[in-house]
Amino acid sequence: MPIEGGKTDMERIGLFSEMEYITVGDKYVSPFNRPFNEAASKNRQILPGGTKEMSSLQAGYFDSQFARIFEGEGYVNLNQVRRRYMLAESKKNLGKAFIPSSGEKKPSGLGSYYGTIGGPVPFFSAQIKPKDKYQPPGKNLYTNPGKKGTGYGYANVTIGKQLSHSSDLYDAARQSYKKESEEHHRLIKGSPFKLHLHPKDYFDTNPYFLEHHLPPLRREEKKEVSFKPFKPSSPGKKAGGMKAGAFDPYPAHSADPYVVKVEKAIPSKGERVFHPPNGPKSRPVESIMALNVKRALNVKNYKNASSTTLGKQLVF
């Protein structure tokens, strides 16, 4: 049986069925003596049915005979059908319309005053109330005539009075400065104060002068520098995965696999997909029309060839 969705080897080659093996001593079996249903003779009864083809026969239907829908029916009047339906519905009425014993209930929702203490208030009624005729009020009193502008082009239109013009001296600043300097010189008494002693600086002229002597200098001892090559304490490590000179020891062998293989889940008998056994393959059959007309045209008989000798069909 092939894999899921695969083909057999014979189907890949393109043959209808595998050729039969002829052995010495086997009897000849005529095709007329072969069973009609070869699969049934080999105990292969569970075979799926093939696809249904559309035809005018009754073989593919449940009923053995085609039944017409409106066979033997008379003309139907739609108005008569409606009247019969209305009459049948009217018979379902038992009597008069049902009236409850307690009467109709009044609503007590928004806009209803049923169940309240005072009832509706006439002030909040939605009816239009009569109103007096509207009389517009009179004009306001004028205490001062209107202004003629913003004040840029008109005189005496602001709240305050108009500023009067006053002329200033050309060199008023120089004259005021002159008066202040004369008053300052008047307050100065005599020449500046001068000391008769020899002047001295605040600090000594020698910036390195010290009262106490400094201690003697200490010379640092110089270490002798050795130019010997550096030698490591242990030999060099060898590359290539060798652990002889490494810091860590060689890891111990472990039987754990590097990658854990995921085992394939083997489905049980009930979970497997049912594949019916393949039926018998068809064999290549020659046409009956060409059995008696096969003739060959070769080098020897091509001169004497005719339609009577070769038949209607010539095979090259």
Curated annotation (Swiss-Prot):
Keyword Magnesium in annotation: no
Region of interest called Disordered, as start-end residue ranges on this chain: 220-242
| Highest taxon above the source species | Eukaryota
Q: Which UniProt keywords apply?
A: Cytoplasm, Cytoskeleton
- Report the transmembrane regions from the record: none
Q: Where does the UniProt entry say this protein principally localizes?
A: cytoplasm
Q: Where is the composition biased (Low complexity)?
A: 227-237
Q: Where in the cell is it found?
A: Cytoplasm, Cytoskeleton, Microtubule organizing center, Centrosome
Determine if Cytoplasm is one of this entry's keywords. Answer: yes
Q: Name one GO cellular component term.
A: centrosome
Q: Please report which protein family the annotation says this sequence is part of.
A: Belongs to the CFAP96 family.
What is the recorded name of this protein? Cilia-and flagella-associated protein 96
Tell me the organism. Answer: Mus musculus (Mouse)
